[in-house]
Amino acid sequence: MALNYFNRYIWLIEVINRHGHISRKDISDLWARSQLNELGESYLPERTFHNHISSIFDTFGIEIKCDRSLGYYIAN
């Protein structure tokens, strides 16, 4: 189970890094098509998304922030 979360964190970091700035909706749409989406969820739940952002900071020291007009981005 922990490995699955770790892989999700890496996936989220890679998605945001690849796009520079990306909307919450676009992240959710990409999640719906991801191979890591083992439950076949049609979106990435909001609470899960924010928990992942917090865990990414705690685990890797990578800060993900949101610019309301541009979307999510890696701040450091």
Name each model-derived stretch.
Residues M1-N76:
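Short, basic/aromatic recognition patches that contact phosphate-bearing ligands
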